[in-house]
Regions:
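ABC transporter nucleotide-binding domains
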Residues: 1-230
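Short catalytic/signature loops enriched in Gly
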Residues: 219-294
């Protein structure tokens, strides 16, 4: 930050994600979700520092890998990204087919990329009749499918989907969630989806990780989180209570600045259950929850 201050944008983020599984990372904007995804792909700003490890099944540590390794062997090949606002990531003067064929050439070295590009489009349910369209000719749903097709070209075993349903109509949200889930279930890929849309999370997740102020404060099976017994952390309970089909009760207050976190639980100033311990002692993630009162 300006003035030479350091900010822990993400800390104590620990989870496992297996083949064929979907973990959804939820939380308010600015809590560190996208920073975590950027760290896994080595896309943080040059002045950012990382610590810890992020291990792929073959033992490669994504946080320790150099740029050459990430560029040649990871991005698109072992870890693929479905970006937020996909239309903004497509070059406006090029067709969808051109984007796909270039990606095929880059990732596979093929000199005849047409068939592979069309196969990736088919897997993403992108219509062949629209392959020669430019980005401005695509609806939000088709732009999302184009981005998904680009992510599927390299057959990466891990997909990162960063807010893939943002800006979509509800029916497109449900369709996008279902399609991403199918890519995971049918191919054995792992999916890490980042979202603040709890309805989409409920539709797709095997596991839910709740982030607050840069930390994972709850990690739970989706069935238990959205059903019974429900969330254990007060912040996670507040997220569900704010849903329109539930109490529609907003969480009071606002998240703290990451550069000015309180000494204890970061949620304590907004929590009706907080006591002196909560305000002074930072809780650790234990048995799936980081809360003194859970």
């Amino acid at each position: 930050m300006a003035g030479g201050r350091y900010v822990e944008a993400v800390s104590e983020a620990e989870f496992r994600l297996g083949a064929g599984e979907c973990l959804v990372l939820v939380g308010e904007s600015g809590c560190g979700k996208s920073v975590l995804a950027s760290a896994l792909l080595g896309l943080l700003p040059g002045n950012a520092e990382t610590a810890g490890s992020a291990l792929l099944p073959d033992g490669l540590d994504l946080l320790a890998a150099d740029e050459d390794t990430l560029a040649r062997t990871v991005r698109g090949r072992r870890v693929a990204l479905v970006p937020q606002s996909p239309a903004a990531h497509l070059t406006p003067v090029r067709t969808v087919r051109s984007h796909l064929e270039e990606t095929v050439r880059e990732l596979t070295g093929s000199r005849t990329p047409r068939a592979a590009a069309e196969a990736a489009a088919a897997r993403a349910a992108f219509p062949a009749s629209h392959l020669d369209h430019h980005p401005h000719q695509l609806s939000g749903g088709l732009a999302q499918r184009a981005a998904t097709a680009l992510a599927l070209v390299g057959d990466a075993p891990l997909l990162l989907a960063d807010e893939p349903t943002t800006g979509l109509d509800r029916d497109l949200v449900e369709r996008t969630a279902d399609e991403l889930r199918a890519h995971t279930r049918d191919s054995g890929r792992a999916l890490l989806m980042i979202t603040h849309d709890l309805a989409a999370a409920r539709r797709i997740a095997d596991t839910v990780a709740v982030m607050y102020a840069g930390r994972i404060v709850e990690l739970a099976a989706a069935e238990a989180f959205f059903g019974e017994p429900g969330p254990r952390h007060p912040y996670a309970r507040g997220l569900l209570a704010a849903l329109p089909e539930r109490a529609f009760t907003p969480i009071p207050g606002a998240p703290p600045e990451l550069g000015d976190l309180p000494p204890g639980c970061a949620f304590a100033p907004r929590c009706a259950l907080a006591d002196a311990t909560c305000r002074t002692v930072r809780p650790r993630l234990t048995e799936g929850v980081a809360c003194h009162r859970a």
